[in-house]
A protein has these predicted regions:
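Alpha-helical cap/lid subdomain in secreted, periplasmic
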Residues: 78-93, 106-166
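Serine-esterase "nucleophile elbow" of acetyl-processing enzymes
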Residues: 26-97, 116-119
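N-terminal export signals
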Residues: 4-27
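Flexible, glycine- and charge-enriched loops at secondary-structure boundaries
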Residues: 65-73, 101, 137-145
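Solvent-exposed loop/turn segments at secondary-structure junctions
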Residues: 52-55, 99-104, 129-134
Length: 166
């Protein structure tokens, strides 16, 4: 429908804006090399994790890396396409495990299977829209403090389990 088209177009536009900032922060080129902030080795595993902005209509039943179906239609797809095109010799393995509607505690609930089991070398997390939005809608009793605490706890837990993750 027209409404679906407009909704998807708005999300894709937001994803493209987000991707450009993510690309600047995560992967930048300096004389043809990857920025020292993120080191991509041969066979590096990259994981995009988060809520609907990451999800962007990905197919949940597709678990293969580097496929458009599991990348969705947002910034994860654009970033993966760029990385795979720019660094074909690195044979990167890129996954998207974003789930629409998720808040930080829901991300934590699926962390073992959807993050730690993948063993990413590089992890990108984009989460927080629903933590705020659902408070405004009266569907969630969270707060900024809960969001910050839950996210910090998740990051610390991840570094304990995957000490070399970037």
């Amino acid at each position: 429908t027209r409404r679906d088209f407009l909704r998807k177009g708005a999300f894709a536009g937001l994803g493209m804006l987000t991707m450009s900032e993510l690309a600047k922060a995560v992967v930048s080129k300096q004389n043809g090399n990857v920025s020292p902030k993120i080191k991509l080795e041969k066979d590096s595993v990259i994981l995009f994790q988060g809520d609907s902005i990451t999800d962007m209509f990905r197919k949940y039943d597709c678990n293969q890396c580097n496929t458009p179906e599991q990348m969705g239609m947002g910034y994860a797809l654009f970033a993966a396409s760029t990385l795979l095109s720019d660094y074909p010799d690195k044979q990167l393995k890129i996954y998207n495990r974003g789930v629409g509607g998720n808040k930080v505690y829901q991300l934590r609930d699926r962390w073992e299977l959807d993050t730690l089991a993948i063993q990413p070398d590089v992890l990108s997390i984009l989460i927080g829209v629903n933590d705020f939005w659902h408070i405004l809608m009266g569907n969630y009793k969270g707060s900024l403090g809960i969001y910050e605490r839950d996210l910090q706890d998740l990051l610390h837990y991840t570094k304990e389990k995957l000490p070399n993750v970037q």
